[in-house]
A protein has these predicted regions:
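Short, surface-exposed basic-aromatic patches at helix termini and helix-loop junctions that form
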Residues: 111-114, 136-144, 206, 227, ...
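Short helix-terminating capping/connector loops at secondary-structure junctions
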Residues: 16-18, 112-117, 147, 215-230, ...
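Extended hydrophobic secondary-structure segments that form protein cores and membrane-embedded regions
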Residues: 22-25, 120-122, 232-238, 261-263
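Short beta-alpha junction loops
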Residues: 125-127, 239-240, 264-269
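Alpha-helical substrate-recognition element adjacent to the catalytic core
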Residues: 3-6, 11-191
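C-terminal accessory extensions appended to soluble enzyme cores
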Residues: 1-10, 92, 230, 244-245, ...
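Acidic, divalent-metal-coordinating active-site segment for phosphoryl/phosphodiester hydrolysis
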Residues: 238-250
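Conserved Lys-Pro-Asp/Glu-containing loop-to-beta segment of HAD-superfamily phosphomonoesterases
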Residues: 21, 197, 201-240
């Protein structure tokens, strides 16, 4: 398998028409380096907070073998280890998102939002989906790291006949079309999210295909366009296990319209 450094393009083509590029983003350590911690247990039953990047490295060991971590011997998970990532942490999520450092896929997120492209957030977190939406809305309206509510609205106005209304209405309708998948919400597992992320991506692919078909018909009717409209999705994640499982799933299905990007170090296409 060839691996190359790439950037995801998006938005409108040279004719000013939608280019049918869509995005699916993991959240933690991909879009942002959130301060939220998983709680693990050390020898002596002391609770130790573990960041998401470290958890991606150590999660295969937790509860299976003891290991040293920041001067402690970790023997397993603490009680309710993902408490900060679930509904109990809903309010804190938005606050953390406002102050968190941006991650390796942030520039793509800027292009996606400012260009009015449809996206999905597919994360191992277990917050209410509405909480993820509120977080995105808050950082866009705050102008975090180059995001622009005004640019997003101007891009959405190019979709006349597809979405209409004033700026706030356009933006809310836009978010209605996007998807927010906290895969450990409800019965999902934050410790082993790979299969749930695949299910979420599969749902987003179906959603994108449906949107693209509707958009293609509209553009053909309004502009007498006879091109082949093929949607392309870029999925990015910093967790190698998630990336490998998604890549295998797509290869097994023969899905050629989804590009998978591993973002742990340099952003690479798998």
């Amino acid at each position: 398998m060839e691996i190359m450094s790439v950037e995801v393009s998006e938005g409108f083509n040279e004719e000013g028409l939608p280019d049918f590029k869509y995005y699916a983003f993991d959240w933690d350590d991909n879009l942002m380096y959130m301060p939220t911690e998983i709680m693990v247990k050390s020898f002596g039953d002391q609770e130790i907070g573990m960041g998401t990047a470290d958890f991606a490295e150590y999660r295969g060991k937790i509860g299976k073998e003891d290991f040293d971590y920041k001067g402690h011997t970790i023997v397993g998970f603490a009680e309710n280890p993902f408490r900060n990532f679930g509904v109990d942490g809903n309010d804190q999520f938005v606050k953390d998102a406002m102050i968190a450092k941006t991650g390796p896929s942030w520039n793509d997120f800027i292009e996606c939002i400012n260009g009015g492209s449809i996206f999905a957030i597919i994360t191992a977190r277990g917050h209410n989906p509405e909480t993820l939406r509120e977080g995105v809305e808050a950082i866009v309206k705050d102008g975090k790291g180059g995001l622009s509510f005004e640019s997003c609205v101007e891009s959405l106005k190019k979709y006349k006949g597809i979405i209409d209304g004033d700026g706030e209405e356009l933006f809310q309708e836009y978010l209605d079309l996007c998807r927010f998948h906290p895969v450990s919400f409800g019965a999902g597992s934050a410790a082993n999210p790979e299969e749930e992320k695949i299910k979420a991506l599969e749902q987003f692919i179906k959603h994108v295909n449906s949107l693209s078909e509707e958009l293609a018909v509209t553009m053909e009717l309004e502009n007498d366009i006879k091109n082949n409209f093929v949607p392309m999705i870029g999925f990015s994640d910093d967790d190698k296990a998630n990336v490998d499982n998604v890549k295998k799933y797509l290869d097994d299905k023969g899905e050629e319209n989804v590009n998978v990007y591993y973002t742990k170090t340099d952003k690479t296409k798998m």
